[in-house]
């Protein structure tokens, strides 16, 4: 139901050390600092908003931007947002990871946080297997799936529910 419009802005130097997310009637607008001079913008716009052109996205950004001055915009990239959680985390000895494992709305970067948590669990499982002198095989993948699947399902559905609350028109 949403499209993420992403672009980079170059701007006058600012103390750019905090991410910011604004919830607009069109969808969440995230400011993700890259340096004192650059910021990544992710604007997840509801399809009901009928915002389609790059110029409309730039105009909306300008409306909500209160921080950055003398802006130069990069080209906008568009990504259709979808919600998917894999039923099976591995096949043979191939493990799905990151967005191939769980695609959720980029609300406050929670998909990335889920991937970092998954990575920590995988690393801990690898260390445990190596400490026992065992070889890494399909059992590792099965254990990883067992430890992460229910949490990922619950967490991703919670993010999906929270995101849907922001779409409610009052």
Features from the language model and the residues they span:
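Conserved FAD-binding catalytic core of PHBH/FMO-like flavoproteins
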Residues: 1-76
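Short amphipathic alpha-helical/adjacent loop interface patches that line ligand
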Residues: 2, 116-119, 148, 159
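Short beta->alpha junction loops/turns
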Residues: 12, 46, 109-112, 147
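FAD/FMN-dependent oxidoreductases across multiple families
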Residues: 49-138
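C-terminal helical "tail/cap" subdomain of flavin- and related membrane-associated enzymes
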Residues: 66, 124-170
């Amino acid at each position: 139901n949403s499209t993420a419009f992403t672009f980079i802005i170059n701007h006058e130097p600012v103390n750019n050390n905090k991410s910011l997310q604004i919830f607009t009637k069109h969808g969440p607008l995230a400011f993700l600092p890259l340096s004192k001079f650059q910021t990544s913008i992710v604007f997840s716009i509801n399809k009901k908003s009928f915002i389609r052109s790059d110029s409309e996205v730039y105009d909306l950004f300008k409306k909500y931007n209160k921080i950055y001055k003398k802006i130069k915009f990069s080209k906008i990239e568009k990504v259709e947002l979808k919600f998917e959680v894999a039923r099976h985390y591995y096949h043979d000895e191939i493990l799905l990871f990151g967005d191939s494992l769980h695609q959720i709305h980029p609300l406050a970067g929670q998909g990335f946080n889920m991937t970092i948590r998954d990575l920590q669990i995988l690393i801990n499982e690898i260390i445990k297997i190596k400490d026992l002198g065992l070889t890494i095989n399909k059992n590792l993948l099965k254990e990883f799936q067992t430890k992460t699947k229910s949490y990922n399902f619950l967490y991703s559905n919670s993010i999906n529910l929270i995101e849907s609350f922001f779409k409610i028109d009052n």
